[in-house]
Each structure stands twice: as C-alpha cells, then as structure tokens.
C-alpha cells in the first residue's frame, strides 16, 4: 500500500508493518524498534545480518534524550547542538550513543552503542511524532545494492512486501 497520510503510516508501524519513506538522503525502511518480528522482516528483506545494528530515527530531541544521560556534559552539548543548531541541522548527523536498558538487543546488534539521528526531514519528523517515538531506519535496498532514491526504486526492490509513505 502507498499512503500519503502520516497518521495511517504511523498506524502501520504500530501494527508491526515495515514502511519505506523518504529521508534526508535516500529512502529508508523503518519499523517499530520494539517489535522484534517487524525488525526481523527488515533484516530478511535486506538480507542483512543482525550483528550490524541499525539507526534509530527520532522526530525531536525529547524522544532520545534518555540516551544522552550518561554522556559527559561537553559531549552531550555537542550532540544536542548538532541536532538543534540552525546551521548544523542543514545536514543529518548520526551519533553512536551508549545504549540504555530500554534499547532492544536486536537494534544495536553486537555493539554496546546505538546509532541515533534526530531527523530534519519534515515528513520523517511528522512520522516519528505521530508514531510517538523513534523508529528503526535503514536504507531501502537489499544488501549490496544501491539505496533507493525514489518511491519507484524502493518499489522495484520490495514491491508489495512492504508499505510506502509518499510525500
């Protein structure tokens, strides 16, 4: 299914579906990070090993603030500034942060850290906010293939195996 409704897309995520959506650079695949079956579906679609881990994509700082608590104040300020400073937000910055006890093991793979980005893409911001928190994000492509740059390319890779959020 292809939808342009943020609320419908958020509901699909809550129901355990995998969703393709545009991000700052390429199309991404996402799911509810706490739904292990949805996450497993992404790994199978991409032919990706679980050990690699994925990015958590947030709509605003508050959705991932708990992951900043263990950072030294100087580092925490640097991370926050990269996500909130007007000039810095013109590019997407992903940080590796200490995973707390709330981050499922399947998200971080074999690593003690988790990749986190507070998105600046308006559609992704709305999607995360409507979902009610951060979501899984990984490029929309099978491992070894070029990431999808459009809805059409994502659809060529995954056709009716997933749902799509179009702008």
Where are the regions that the model predicts?
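Active-site-adjacent structural elements in enzyme catalytic cores
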Residues: 1-167
